[in-house]
Swiss-Prot record:
Gene Ontology MF terms in the entry: cyclohexyl-isocyanide hydratase activity
UniProt key word Lyase: yes
Protein name as catalogued: Isonitrile hydratase
UniProt cross-references to CDD domains, sorted A to Z: GATase1_PfpI_2
Organism taxonomic ancestry: Bacteria, Pseudomonadati, Pseudomonadota, Gammaproteobacteria, Pseudomonadales
Keywords (A to Z) from UniProt: Lyase
Field pH dependence: Optimum pH is 6.0-6.5.
Gene behind the chain: inhA
Organism for this UniProt entry: Pseudomonas putida (Arthrobacter siderocapsulatus)
EC code: 4.2.1.103
């Protein structure tokens, strides 16, 4: 039977959180990849791309891999019990529970990060301990069957790491080559540790409203989990 891989799809998802890992994992042999949401109505990503679910919470098969991407829409998801219940149910049966970027905050709101090493987008890293996680500032972090990827583009690194676990290093390397994944960006500003201070300051300024809102939501989620 084909390996069942499911990505949570939701309004205001960060499309690269989803489509980067999707391309990697959908390129593996003998897999079936699902885009899962409450219904089959297309959703709009945070940058305006229309994405169509392929199955619903009700009809989704038992998944071998569940992946929660991040994006502007994670705040509402963290307080959406229908979504959290679906994630918990699938996570209890899945071989691997995974996330990209701020999708790890949703896993945390579902109670799946307690005592676990995890990562997320750098701007929201300090929220992880509130959800019981042990924060690690790596692009990909594994703790048992939990894989979390850092911000946005780290999703490709995450997916290749998971691909190696699923099908072996040779096939994972083949997929990497087929996708010509050999990053060589023109600037060394992809991390707050290497970006110019003025760029970091501007990025933090732009993230501040979202950080404030997500901090409040994270505190409420922690209270529901009796972590506060």
């Amino acid at each position: 039977m084909a390996l069942q891989i499911g990505f949570l799809l939701f309004p205001q998802v960060q499309q690269l959180d989803l489509t980067g890992p999707y391309d990697v994992l959908a390129s593996l042999p003998d897999v079936q990849v699902h885009l899962v949401w409450k219904d089959l109505v297309p959703v709009t990503s945070s940058t305006g791309l229309q994405l169509k679910p392929t199955t619903t919470f009700e009809d989704c098969p038992v998944l071998d891999v569940i992946c929660v991407p991040g994006g502007a829409g994670v705040g509402p998801l963290m307080e959406d019990e229908q979504t959290l219940d679906f994630i918990r149910s699938q996570a209890a049966q899945a071989r691997y529970v995974t996330s990209v970027c701020t999708g790890s905050l949703v896993l945390g709101a579902a109670g799946l990060l307690q005592g676990k090493r995890a990562t997320t987008h750098w701007a929201y890293h300090d929220l992880l301990p509130t959800l019981g996680a042990i924060p690690v500032k790596d692009r990909v972090v594994r703790d048992g069957n939990l894989f979390t990827g850092g911000g946005i583009t780290a999703g490709i690194d995450f997916a290749l790491t998971l691909a190696q676990e699923l099908v072996g290093v040779d096939t994972a390397q083949l997929v990497q080559l087929q996708l010509e994944y050999a990053p060589a960006p023109p600037f060394d500003s992809g991390s707050p540790d290497t970006a110019p201070s003025a760029v970091v300051d501007e990025a933090r300024k732009r993230a501040a409203p979202s950080l404030k809102l997500r901090t409040e939501i994270t505190e409420r989620a922690a209270a529901k989990l009796n972590l506060r």
